[in-house]
Amino acid sequence: MSLDLVHFPNYKKTFFGSSFQSDTLALLTRIRDEIGCRYVTHTYRGRVGDCTKVNSADLTVLITLPATWVARYSSKNYFAIDPVFQEDAPYYRNDTSAIARDLKEDADICPAVAELLHDAEKHGLGNLFIAVSARNPKGVAGCTVFTFEVEDEDRTQFLARMRPRLLSLAGIIHGTVCGCKDANSVASLLTPREVDCLRWAANGKTDGEIAEILSIARWTVVTYLQNAKIKLNCSNRTSAVATALSLGIIDMPEVQHLV
């Protein structure tokens, strides 16, 4: 097993490869600014730039956390209890997809995880940690953790409101880090109408609303999205939208429709 660690402390440049660094750091900064998260961590089982090995023993971790917290995390050996890195974590399983989970669920059943999250909050990382699954067209799985400071809104309502957006963004980050960007071959499989339906779905529109916008029947929209899902090798609509976004087949939607 090998570990590739890519660290942008507080969204600052590092000594990592300049091409990867510029594109990825710009993406992470844009995501932070758009959704108001504090920090982003992404991990997937594979090497940087390798999007082909399913269930690899290798691990890539991309973080924007402060260097002081990374040092503390290491000294406390939090890796051993972090729910995102456990062997049975649901985010990497082949039979699951489109997961957006408040890590408080893990803290409620494990005192060690509760201690980890409390320590992270005490050190300014936020009070809400949401783990989001991602999967590329080749089946390589990953997980993004977004941290937020939520005061006035119920956690459950916040997660429900942000879930579609976070799933899309996790897919974009995943595709960027593991280098699965061969959009031309995938895009050529999709019809213009399938792309249109994916684009409107990414903007939060229902099947009925998409049908009205495109002046077609609702069942036709369902068929287009089903075909797109199959062509993108995705198990559900949300995953198909996230994959299309990560490959640049459709543009990242504005966040206003979720507010």
From Swiss-Prot:
Region: C12-HSL binding, residue numbers: 76-179
GO MF annotation list: DNA binding
Keyword Transcription: yes
Superkingdom of this protein's organism: Bacteria
Record-annotated HTH luxR-type domain positions: 183-248
CDD domains on file: LuxR_C_like
Alphabetized SMART domains for the sequence: HTH_LUXR (SM00421)
One Pfam family cited in the UniProt record for this chain: Autoind_bind
GO biological process, alphabetically ordered: quorum sensing; regulation of DNA-templated transcription
Keywords: DNA-binding, Quorum sensing, Transcription, Transcription regulation
DNA-binding region: 207-226
Function comment: Transcriptional regulator involved in the global control of Brucella gene expression. Mediates the effects of the quorum sensing autoinducer C12-HSL (N-dodecanoyl-homoserine lactone) on a large and diverse number of genes.
Entry protein name: HTH-type quorum sensing-dependent transcriptional regulator VjbR
Organism for this UniProt entry: Brucella ovis (strain ATCC 25840 / 63/290 / NCTC 10512)
